[in-house]
Amino acid sequence: MEILKLYKQQLLEEIQNLGYESLRYSIFSDKNPGEWEVVIEFDKLEQLYFIYGTMDRGSYNGKHSFKTFEEAKIAFLQFLYDIILINKYYVEQNMPTNYYSPLWSKNPPDIDPRISQ
């Protein structure tokens, strides 16, 4: 759908404006989401937008449905913001974070240079 391409572009621009590029997210993708992603999908049959977060590849936190893109957009961006807040809390409490992001981690993880990324 052409409108979903436009909506995806809008979300990508918002993500860039907010400085959220290092976060994990999936926007109207046909592929299965990865670990720790915030996902926005559109169900053509139900005509609903769904927002949810994945944990590992096989599980997710409850799906929230929205009738309009504007509602879904706000929820998606809020979810990303909440990911930042929770991981900042984890850092403050010396707990492991879900993944590395400069938005909450002071130092990048130690990466073995012999392992290709």
Language-model segments: what does each one mean?
Residues K67-Y81:
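A short, charged, amphipathic alpha-helix used as a generic interaction element across diverse proteins
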